[in-house]
Amino acid sequence: MSEPATAEDTALGLLSRPGFAKLLAYRIFAMLSYQVAAVTVGWHIYEVTRNPFSLGLVGLAEVLPFFCVAPFAGYLVDHLPRRRLGMVACSGLIATALVLTGVATGWLPFEGVWPIYAAIALTGMVRAFLSPIYNALFARVLARDQFARGAGLGAVVFQAGMVAGPALGGVLVGFGGKGLSYAVATAFALVAMACLATLKVEEPMHTGPAAPIFKSIAEGARFVVGNRIMVGAMALDMFSVLLGGVVAMLPAFLHEILHHGPEGLGILRAMPALGSVCVGLWLARHPLHRNAGRVLLFAVAGFGLCVIGFGLSQHFWLSALILLFYGAFDGVSVVIRSTILQLATPEEMRGRVSSINGIFISSSNELGAFYAGTMARLLGLVPAVVLGGFAVLSVAGITAWKNPTLRKLNLRDLQ
């Protein structure tokens, strides 16, 4: 059993800590800026081209720079003042949103879509810094025994931004136009920068010459690969999302199976995030200390069962309920993996390890959508999703069998 929490160790107590509250504010406002701009860009690009393929190029223009910059971003986070580096990253978001505002309103004399793609590429490079900076500063504003609760609140903030950002972007475009939406994205990035500018945190002292950049990046990769708990948790999450992602297929299910209009898409898209937020709030109040490995494996298995259930469901509200649990199980995985990342990473490697984790996450999200579409094309919509659910169950079983260190994990042992 865990020890009773003091007032400062409760979820509300953590929010009363100015450093942690400002760090969470930085995270959600940076996320809102990115998400509002991303939704507006999709509308902007399609309005200009009327070509669905151009929407796919938006994702490519963002993710390729992210993958190229992420390893170097982790190195810089580990060797430069993190708060100032975060402010530079926020200035990149501001510059991107300002350029897009100028293009949308005609202030900048650019024509065609390539300036928009260039701005999105800059966003991808900036995004490579956002999570490593958050994770590195997280460990400077909380004590180690507060990491589990803090990770739960961080997951709630992240999911809230994922839900509110696209919704707000759509509303702003609908009622005020693209220029207003981009301007609001600029304002959100300014608020994120202000949060970091006023954040009082003791930065780690860097003594001695820095290792060569590629040697340092390789050192971080070797650390992750050599840590069976960390690499097991990352791989488990990556393969479960890669094989069991159903969000990309929601429009097809609504059209072909559930026979619901576009308003149903908003409901179904919100359900996983709602489930994740609920479980994040619960785990912030009741953090896991014992049997975290078993809980993680059961959560992934539950995630797989939800994928199977969603694939077989032919009723809209049953599908919505299943997606709620789908998000809840995924939320458990996110919180446990985030806590492992914070507890098991040495201070001097937080940036590099967080960047590697970001590459795992982005790989599963981006490739998962491609995999889901390919399998649906080859096997049909329902068989592809059901098969993906069984594949997730297999991944959970194989991990439990092959990685007993992760299976027997108690988070208290890492503190």
Task: List the predicted regions and their residue ranges.
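Short hydrophobic/alpha-helical segments at membrane-entry points of transmembrane helices
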Residues: 22-23, 111-119, 232, 317-323
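Intrinsic disorder in cytosolic terminal tails and internal cytosolic loops
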Residues: 1-15, 215, 402-415
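Glycine/proline-centered helix-kink
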Residues: 39, 159-170, 248, 280, ...
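Helix-loop junctions on the cytosolic side of multi-pass membrane transporters
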Residues: 136, 140, 182, 188-211, ...
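Helix-loop boundary and gating motifs at the non-cytosolic
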Residues: 6-64, 222-272
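Intracellular juxtamembrane helix-capping segments at the cytosolic ends
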Residues: 41, 129-142, 332-345
